[in-house]
Each structure stands twice: as structure tokens, then as C-alpha cells.
Amino acid sequence: MKVQVLNLDGTAGKGEVELSDDVFGLEPRADILHRVVTWQLENRRGIARKARERSDVARTGKKFGRQKGGGTARHGDRKAPIFIGGGKAHGPRVREFNISLNKKVRALGLKMALSSKAKAGLVVVDNLDVDAKTKALVGQLAKANWGKKVLVIDGEGVNDNFAKAARNIVGVNVLPAIGANVYDILKHDTLVLTRAAVEKLEARFNG
């Protein structure tokens, strides 16, 4: 699959880039993408802190007060949730959200996410060489008209000037190739890859 290389303002750049069909030419499957996104979001969740319940608190278990004639309820011990210092009724318990997912399924999900963006209009730029000026980058992206949410993926590391210029632009996010993931790719309107990012991603699956 050949894609025209563009400049950051959306104009035609130099030459074309050949995208591997093994990475960018798959037919996306909703069930695979759903499994990978669910796995990602579950792994982001923190572990809930356990609350001390009635059996966990250290209070006397001796019955206080008489059974009859005291004019009060027939309480058995001070651990009951209605007392100050008593256990929590139906409190939160420790839950592990780190579900496992086969590496091959994760890799397949990422390739399908890239393929879905390739079908929708993947953008490839030569590089991210810009001045570290937010105003200038905003003007370029406005001309390109890539949508409200744009994910830009660079090669080994993100270009410093581009990262500085883009960090205050709402809806523009930047990642190195090693950070490419299904959730971030799917939640953006447009995926922009540099030549270096294409090489890194293809080497990631073919290496």
C-alpha cells in the first residue's frame, strides 16, 4: 500500500511511502479491538483499598447491657456498624483489575488499529522538524484540517521542538513509536505517522 507523504500543513511532500500490508492492510475486527482496549483500561485502574469490616476491627465482643429491661436494643458487641469504631458494612475489598491478554492478541489488535486508520485516511509526514512555537504549529495544523483530535507518532523519540510546540494545543497528542497503543489510536480522529514511525512500527512486528 503506497501513501503520499505530506507536510505538516497538509500540502504534498516528497515522494511516497510503502506501507506493509501485514501491519497496515488487515481487516479490523471489533471483537479483537474491544478485548485489547478493555485490557488496557483495566490495567490502568488502581487497586481499591480494603475497609475493615465487622470481623476486622478490634473491639470487645462481650455483650454489653442486659437482654431485657434496659430500655435499649439487644446489642451483642461493639463491632456492629452502627457504633463509632465499629466495622464498615459491606465495605470495599481488595480487587485486582490486572487481567491478562495473550501477546499475540495484543499485537494483532495494534495492527488492526493501524489498519483501521489506514482505511480511514492515515497521514504520513516526512518528519516533525518545526520551530518550538505553538502559534506557528497551530497555523500549520489549521491548514491541514486533520480534525479536532490528532495523534502524532514519531520514531525512536519525539522531536523536542514539536513536543514543546504541541503540548499546549488541545486535541493534539504526541507519542514515540514504542508508545503506540490501540486505545490512543482509536480515540483520535486522525493518526499522523512520521517515516521513522512507520519503520519502527513495521520493525516491531517483523523483528
Curated annotation (Swiss-Prot):
Source organism of this protein record: Novosphingobium aromaticivorans (strain ATCC 700278 / DSM 12444 / CCUG 56034 / CIP 105152 / NBRC 16084 / F199)
Lineage summary: Bacteria, Pseudomonadati, Pseudomonadota, Alphaproteobacteria, Sphingomonadales
Keywords: Ribonucleoprotein, Ribosomal protein, RNA-binding, rRNA-binding
Alphabetized GO MF terms: rRNA binding; structural constituent of ribosome
Protein name: Large ribosomal subunit protein uL4
Function: One of the primary rRNA binding proteins, this protein initially binds near the 5'-end of the 23S rRNA. It is important during the early stages of 50S assembly. It makes multiple contacts with different domains of the 23S rRNA in the assembled 50S subunit and ribosome.
UniProt cross-references to Pfam families, sorted A to Z: Ribosomal_L4
Subunit comment: Part of the 50S ribosomal subunit.
Entry GO CC: ribonucleoprotein complex; ribosome
GO biological process, one term: translation
Region annotation (Disordered) ranges: 53-85
Family of the protein in this entry: Belongs to the universal ribosomal protein uL4 family.
Superkingdom of the organism of origin: Bacteria
NCBIfam families: rplD_bact
